[in-house]
Design a protein with these regions (language model features):
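Active-site hotspot residues in diverse enzymes, especially metal/ion-binding acidic/histidine motifs
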Residues: 1-245
Length: 245
């Protein structure tokens, strides 16, 4: 298997975005966001389809570079009928719930990017990529983070964010939404005005707030990220409080 560093993946992501920008429908535009469906279909020649991938909703995307059947589930939860979907090596299968009204579009877009990146790495490294996965031929994306114990999946997850949120797009979108060249604090309680701008920016870019905040931090465009815990700014740990007393 090919071992790629974060810098290697940034280089690959840059090459993919450069090729995307040369597509006739994109060429000449100042890129502010990536249409991940268009990139997937027009640049990579992949097809996106939808099905119910698991009974508990944990599995949200899958793909394969070969012909193989995968189990899918009926829309009616009471049905016991076995169903299979035949992947053709060029199809990305996304959980159908991600297309429902009110679903997290950022999660859906990231899943498309994630599954696309399996194909990108296979195209770039056909003799190295996928050969260490104990014969695995189907790649799955899960709703919850299962950790980075799988090096192959870490590379795909990292590249997926880089392609969905390339540096030039993030910088231009920050300018568009009045966040300047660097966001000092992301905190919905103590910096609500900037938080609303950030929220609008994430929606505009088709990304989840979590993915965008992590990407901005990686790029040095966000100094402090309190997205998951806005009160961490003022919280005093019990041990520290005991020392004071």
């Amino acid at each position: 298997m090919k071992y790629l560093s974060r810098n290697d993946l940034e280089t690959i992501g840059g090459r993919v975005i450069a090729a995307y920008k040369r597509l006739p429908a994109i060429s000449g535009q100042a890129l502010e966001r990536v249409d991940i469906d268009f990139l997937c279909q027009e640049l990579l020649g992949l097809r996106i389809d939808y099905a119910r991938l698991s009974l508990n909703g944990e599995k949200i995307g899958l793909t394969s570079s070969c012909d193989i059947g995968v189990e899918v589930f009926p829309k009616d939860p009471s049905s016991t009928e076995e169903q299979y979907y035949m992947l053709d090596g060029k199809t990305i299968l996304i959980e159908s719930d991600l297309m429902k009204e009110g679903a997290n579009i950022g999660r859906r877009n990231y899943t498309v990017s994630h599954e696309s990146c399996h194909h990108i790495l296979k195209m770039l490294f056909p003799h190295d990529y996928g050969v260490q996965a104990s014969g695995r031929s189907v790649h799955c994306c899960y709703r919850s983070n299962r950790g980075n114990g799988d090096w192959e999946e870490w590379q795909v997850e990292t590249l997926a964010a880089m392609i969905l949120l390339p540096p030039e797009c993030v910088v231009r979108s920050m300018e568009r939404f009045g966040l300047g060249t660097q966001m000092r604090l992301l905190n919905r309680v103590f910096a609500p005005a900037d938080y609303k701008k950030f929220e609008a920016m994430a929606s505009f870019m088709g990304a989840s707030k979590t993915a965008l905040s992590i990407r901005m931090t990686q790029l040095g465009l966000l100094k402090r990220n309190d997205l998951s815990d806005p009160y961490s700014l003022v919280r005093v740990d019990m041990d520290e409080e005991d020392r004071i007393l």
